[in-house]
């Protein structure tokens, strides 16, 4: 690698492109690529081209730390990553010790950005759990609700806990809550039967799309047809190879982005993404794309240059991120507080005729806490 070339802001991105959550990592990779190409073609950041490199963490905490160290040896000055919560929680310990700026597009656990060098683009687990309960209650989708969640996953268990707390406040009756673990995530007959016997009108699934696809198929065979509601981990279910999309008809989930939105920015992004990668972007691609442009805005506000140390860049970006207001694909007028959490409005989508359709949702600001509700 020619280090004599002006490398601008050495933006470095890490995501998993193999493993259980490969569809998310690939989406993040492509979203970043599109943004970097656009910015570099327009002159870069503060007149400097972005040079970036990515490592595949395979959604594994140990491999994620190894990938971080590889990137640090390469000369990383800032990090967009990781894609999922458990690896991100491990990596943020390292980036904090190094005072290296980190912006995750999609790690939702509170602990993923527990230090002042870390920010996120997505909603946190508490926000998703409480917002989902609010939407279900405020729109009278059901009174009796069951939950199927992954107790071995920080993303799933974090959303579940806050959903149950908010559901009680909103007058929803959680008639069944059954967990599974990473070691037992193929047969959901017990969880489905429990929800069915309890008379659940709606089943909340704060899980990833792989397990959700199995639950929908097995529930169909069991003659159980409640309403289904999930969170951003559900995004991608329609792209799952071998999955019968008709089983997801009327499935609803919380997300900051839908490719069917009619605003000009989204439609341009979708068209450009399809041209570049031959696929329709999911939320994770939009989150990643927004990460690059948010860093650009903060870097330009603080006049960051590539000759600065990673630590000095981090200090500048910590200030810049809390001062910008960013209009992106995943939200308009997005702002960040010092704890790294974004404020933006969520969207609910429903699957209809094999496509995601946006549903208006303006009830909750993303940075509201449970005490605010």
Features from the language model and the residues they span:
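Hydrophobic alpha-helical segments within soluble ligand-binding/sensing domains
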Residues: 64, 121-144, 157-159, 185-189, ...
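Segments of small-molecule ligand-sensing domains
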Residues: 275-285, 296-355
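Periplasmic-binding protein-like
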Residues: 71-83, 103-105, 146-149, 199-209, ...
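An alpha-beta-alpha
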Residues: 17, 118-179, 202
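Extracytoplasmic "Venus flytrap"
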Residues: 7, 14-31, 55-61, 84, ...
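Extracellular/periplasmic periplasmic-binding protein-like sensory domains
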Residues: 216-289, 350
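Single conserved hydrophobic/aromatic residue that forms the stacking wall/gate
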Residues: 1-13, 363, 370-373
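Beta-alpha junction/loop-to-helix N-cap segments that form part of ligand/metal-binding clefts
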Residues: 23-30, 42-112, 121, 180-186, ...
């Amino acid at each position: 690698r020619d280090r004599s070339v002006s490398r601008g802001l050495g933006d470095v991105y890490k995501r998993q492109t193999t493993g259980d959550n490969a569809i998310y990592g690939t989406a993040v990779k492509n979203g970043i690529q599109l943004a970097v190409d656009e910015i570099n073609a327009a002159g870069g950041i503060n007149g400097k081209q972005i040079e970036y490199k990515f490592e595949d963490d395979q959604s594994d905490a140990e491999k994620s730390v190894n990938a971080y160290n590889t990137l640090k040896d390469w000369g990383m000055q800032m990090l967009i990553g990781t894609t999922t919560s458990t690896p991100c929680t491990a990596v943020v310990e390292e980036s904090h010790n190094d005072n290296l700026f980190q912006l995750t597009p999609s790690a939702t656990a509170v602990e993923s950005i527990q230090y002042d060098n870390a920010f996120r683009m997505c909603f946190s687990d508490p926000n998703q759990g409480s917002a989902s309960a609010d939407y279900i209650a405020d729109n009278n989708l059901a009174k009796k609700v069951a939950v199927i969640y992954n107790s071995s996953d920080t993303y799933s268990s974090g959303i579940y806990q806050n959903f149950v707390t908010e559901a009680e406040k909103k007058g929803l009756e959680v008639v069944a809550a059954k967990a599974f673990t990473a070691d037992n995530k193929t047969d959901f007959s017990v969880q489905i039967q429990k929800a069915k016997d309890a008379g659940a009108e709606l089943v909340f699934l704060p899980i990833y799309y792989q397990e959700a696809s199995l639950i929908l198929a097995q529930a169909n065979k069991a003659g159980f047809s409640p309403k289904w509601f999930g969170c951003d981990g559900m995004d991608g279910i329609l792209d799952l190879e071998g999955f019968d999309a008709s089983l997801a008809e009327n499935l609803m989930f919380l997300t900051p982005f839908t490719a069917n939105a009619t605003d000009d920015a989204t439609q341009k992004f979708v068209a450009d993404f399809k041209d570049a990668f031959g696929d329709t972007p999911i939320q994770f691609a939009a989150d990643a794309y927004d990460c690059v442009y948010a860093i650009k805005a903060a870097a330009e506000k603080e006049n960051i240059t590539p000759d600065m140390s990673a630590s000095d860049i981090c200090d500048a970006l910590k200030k810049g991120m809390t001062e910008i207001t960013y209009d992106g694909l995943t939200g308009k007028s997005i702002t960040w507080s010092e704890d790294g959490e974004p404020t933006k409005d969520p969207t609910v989508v429903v699957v209809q005729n094999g496509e995601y359709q946006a549903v208006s949702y303006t009830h909750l600001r993303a940075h509201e806490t449970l005490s605010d509700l």
